[in-house]
Structures are given as structure tokens and as C-alpha cells.
């Protein structure tokens, strides 16, 4: 029960930080709905990212997915979260749990689609 309250407090604190600094929002939760994750695509410098991501190479998309993992690590401070969240090009249970904890429900489908796009 105490662990739940600690996690809940950490989550609330991170949400408060997001509200205070919307321009630095890692998940762009305050962006308008028409702002899509699937904007322009680049085909250069693929080696900068995980080689297991063999789908569409979109830096902005990969950055947003990676930011979910970074924020999840910052909330829970578990060493394995950062690596497991990115494994299999974000197509794993840890990423899905992080997404559910950190993102508003209306963005879940958009991020699931993004994972499918980069991991094909």
C-alpha cells in the first residue's frame, strides 16, 4: 500500500511538472489533435537508432517514443525500465505499461500505431 502511494505521488509530481512546462512536454500532450505523430519522414542516419526498428524512420516519432521510456524511468527509477521499454522497437509490455501510466487515454491508439510504424 505504501509503494502504491509512493508511485502515485511520483506520477502526480511528474504531471505537475508537465503542466508547469508545456513547451518541454515529452509527450506533447498539450498539442492540438491535428498534430500527428506521423509527420515528415527522413531516410538518412538510420544507424542513430535501434537497429530492431526496421519500419518507417521518422526522427520525431522515434524521439517521442523514446521520451515515453525516459519519463517512465524518471518516474519509477528502476534500472531495467529504460532498456526493457525500448526492446523489440518499443513493442513490449513495459512500453505499454509506461504509456498507460504517462499518457492520456486518448493518445494511446496514436502511440500504438507509431510503434507499429517504426517496428515493421
UniProtKB/Swiss-Prot annotation:
Disulfide bonds: 53-89, 69-85, 72-98
Family: Belongs to the arthropod CHH/MIH/GIH/VIH hormone family.
Leader sequence segment: 1-27
Main location: secreted
Keywords: Amidation, Carbohydrate metabolism, Cleavage on pair of basic residues, Disulfide bond, Glucose metabolism, Hormone, Neuropeptide, Secreted, Signal
Task of the protein: Hormone found in the sinus gland of isopods and decapods which controls the blood sugar level. Has a secretagogue action over the amylase released from the midgut gland. May act as a stress hormone and may be involved in the control of molting and reproduction.
Pfam families: Crust_neurohorm
Entry's Gene Ontology BP terms: circadian rhythm; glucose metabolic process; neuropeptide signaling pathway
Record's protein name: Crustacean hyperglycemic hormones 2
UniProt-recorded Gene Ontology molecular function terms: neuropeptide hormone activity
Any GO CC annotation of this UniProt entry: extracellular region
Subcellular localization, as worded in the UniProt entry: Secreted
Residue list for modification Valine amide: 118
Amino acid at each position: 500500500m505504501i509503494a502504491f502511494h509512493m508511485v502515485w505521488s511520483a506520477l502526480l509530481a511528474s504531471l505537475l511538472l508537465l503542466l508547469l512546462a508545456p513547451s518541454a512536454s515529452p509527450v506533447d500532450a498539450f498539442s492540438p489533435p491535428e498534430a500527428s505523430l506521423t509527420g515528415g519522414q527522413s531516410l538518412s542516419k538510420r544507424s542513430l537508432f535501434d537497429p530492431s526498428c526496421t519500419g518507417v524512420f521518422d526522427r520525431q516519432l522515434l524521439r517521442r517514443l523514446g521520451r515515453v521510456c525516459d519519463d517512465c524511468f524518471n518516474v519509477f527509477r528502476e534500472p531495467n525500465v529504460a532498456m526493457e521499454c525500448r526492446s523489440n522497437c518499443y513493442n513490449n509490455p513495459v512500453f505499454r505499461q509506461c504509456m498507460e501510466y504517462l499518457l492520456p487515454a486518448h493518445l494511446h491508439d496514436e502511440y500504438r500505431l507509431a510503434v507499429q510504424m517504426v517496428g515493421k
